[in-house]
Amino acid sequence: MEPGAAPGPERLFDSHRLPTDGFLLLALLLYAPVGLCLLVLRLFIGVHVFLVSCILPDSVVRRFIVRVMCSVLGLFVQQSDPRLRDVNVQVYIANHVTQFDHNIINLLTSCNTPALNGAPGFICWSRGFMELGVTGSRAELVDSLKAYSSHRENPPLLLFPEEAATNGRAGLLRFSSWPFSILDVVQPVALQVQRPLITVSVADSSWITELLWTFFVPFTVYQVRWMPSVPRRAEELSEDFALRVQEVGG
């Protein structure tokens, strides 16, 4: 999660999924029959992963089982410095690379990500988002999240202040300030995602399309890096707090 030194917007997003290199394109074509078989097989396995995650209560055991099952889907999760994860922090701040970042981090620790876009209901719930019933302004959302965080028994919040998935290579979108208005201590989490043959994510692609491509490729590796918690300074504005956390990410 590197601080963005104002890179051009076009550098932050990938518009083409397929490789332009001739050798990689040939390799992708040769792999395609295998990828299609994996896609079909993983769709069936994915249903079982979903059912298991629904049936089992949130616990270390469930996260372990689902993480192992996700490896069959080609999703591998690595984390560095797990001891830095602060059990007292109620807000995690992460960069945004794919449509499934919140699901991946949830394999490592219990957390909730509020639904910011899209219609509420089964799809929202099945994707692992938390519905707050707030459809108004960001101020109303912040008030709801403050109320949520005031109950210490609730899992921490996982928020993505970029509010859009980037390629994770060229820098970060400028952080929105509202996630830093909830509490005075946050913990940054850096995400890196790698996969062979095709790009990790494409701008404006739907989550269903991204899921199908994820099942098609041989594997996708998520690297999660925990960083020390960052407290707000005295009388520090949320905008300045957001900028400082973004810089700490580097």
How would you describe each model-predicted region?
Residues G35, F76-S80, R85, T98-H102, ...:
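Eukaryotic intrinsically disordered and solvent-exposed regulatory patches
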Residues C37, N88-A94, R152-P161:
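Generic beta-sheet signal
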Residues L24, L28-Y31, G35, L39-V47, ...:
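Amphipathic alpha-helical interface elements that mediate macromolecular binding in regulatory proteins
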Residues L30, D81-L84, H96, T109, ...:
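Residues that form ligand- and interface-recognition hot spots within folded domains
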Residues M1-F76:
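N-terminal membrane-anchoring alpha-helices
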Residues M1-L24, G121-W125, S137-R152, G168, ...:
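Intracellular leaflet-associated regions of eukaryotic membrane-associated proteins
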Residues L43-E140:
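Catalytic core of membrane glycerolipid acyltransferases/transacylases, capturing the structured
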Residues S126, E153-P156, E163-D240:
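A cross-family acyltransferase "interaction/gating" segment
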